[in-house]
């Protein structure tokens, strides 16, 4: 255990929340304002017009395993909008297609990590709600960039996981296997012993930061959140920036609707708003953090 907690990892006064519950709560607020949410429909392709986008087409329903229509086939819906906001996460298919078609990735290529997470229910009294621990090292070797966490939630639940950058050199390394080893560490094992797994998941993480941001606007479209590389790789936190970038996008869209102009010229106000907000300050301070670990763990620490 380190004798001191480094400032970026100090979480006193913060909240440990379920992102799933937070999103559901926000969705309820949105629906109270008369806005429709289509949570069962995935976007299959963007509607391209000119140099920009004009909406999205949802995926077809009622297809068999070979992709052929069944009796209950329903074609995807064409949803048009004056401004379409892409918030698909770091590897969204629509965002990647837009960035490629419109050549929006004019900076460094994005680099990724993979995060594996589990939610456990443990015996009563073992974990204090709000407890946070960040781990470094084993089972990752010193050449790898990554680490783990243990968070205490309410109702005797524990969130734990591990993230590792995908630049590791060993082709036989298995992140999922490494996470299973992680749970055998005496510290983690004591927490989980006698508990049960409730759910699990995995996601990619955009490590590129400020220098890997794509252009975030086109005619009729904006890119926010992880899709825009808004993640602090030092603190491994991005939800707050996803929410803030969504708020800034809303301000930009409101101005576009008021003027009746949703062109790239008007929507270019969005990255300016990002630069004037605390998002720029936070990302700029850690712009070289990941690169500092290019030669391994110990070089990065010092």
Report each predicted region and the residues it spans.
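N-terminal FAD cofactor-binding segment of flavoenzymes
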Residues: 1, 94, 102, 277, ...
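Alpha-helix capping and helix-loop boundary segments enriched in small/acidic/polar residues
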Residues: 107, 170-173, 212-215, 233-241, ...
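FAD-binding beta-loop-beta segment adjacent to the flavin cofactor pocket
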Residues: 202-233
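Alpha-helix N-cap/helix-initiation motif
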Residues: 11-15, 19, 74, 105, ...
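Active-site-proximal substrate-binding core of FAD-dependent oxidoreductases
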Residues: 229-235, 247-300
């Amino acid at each position: 255990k380190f004798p001191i907690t480094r400032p970026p990892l100090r979480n006193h006064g913060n909240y440990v929340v379920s992102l799933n519950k937070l999103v559901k709560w926000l969705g309820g607020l949105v629906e109270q304002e008369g806005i429709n949410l289509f949570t069962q429909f995935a976007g299959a392709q963007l509607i391209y017009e000119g140099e920009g986008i004009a909406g999205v087409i949802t995926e077809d329903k009622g297809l068999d395993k070979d992709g052929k229509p069944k009796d209950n086939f329903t074609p995807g819906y064409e949803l048009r909008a004056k401004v379409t906001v892409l918030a698909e996460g770091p590897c969204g298919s629509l965002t990647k297609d837009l960035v490629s078609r419109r050549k929006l990735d004019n900076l460094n290529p994005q680099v990724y990590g993979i995060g594996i997470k589990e939610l456990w229910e443990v015996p009563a009294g073992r974990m204090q709600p709000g407890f946070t621990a960040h781990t470094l090292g084993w089972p990752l070797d010193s050449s790898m960039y990554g680490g783990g966490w243990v968070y205490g939630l309410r109702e005797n639940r524990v969130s734990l996981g591990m993230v590792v950058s995908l630049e590791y050199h060993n082709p036989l390394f298995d992140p999922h296997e490494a996470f299973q080893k992680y749970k055998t560490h005496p510290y983690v094992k004591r927490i989980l012993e006698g508990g049960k797994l409730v759910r699990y998941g995995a996601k990619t993480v955009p490590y590129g930061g400020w220098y890997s941001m794509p252009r975030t606007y086109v005619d009729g479209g904006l890119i926010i959140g992880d899709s825009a590389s808004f993640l602090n790789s030092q603190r491994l936190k991005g939800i707050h920036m996803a929410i803030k970038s969504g708020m800034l996008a809303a301000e930009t869209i409101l101005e576009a609707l008021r003027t009746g102009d949703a062109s790239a010229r008007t929507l270019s106000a969005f990255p300016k708003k990002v630069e004037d907000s605390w998002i720029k300050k936070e990302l700029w301070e850690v712009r070289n953090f990941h690169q500092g670990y290019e030669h391994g763990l110990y070089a990065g620490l010092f």
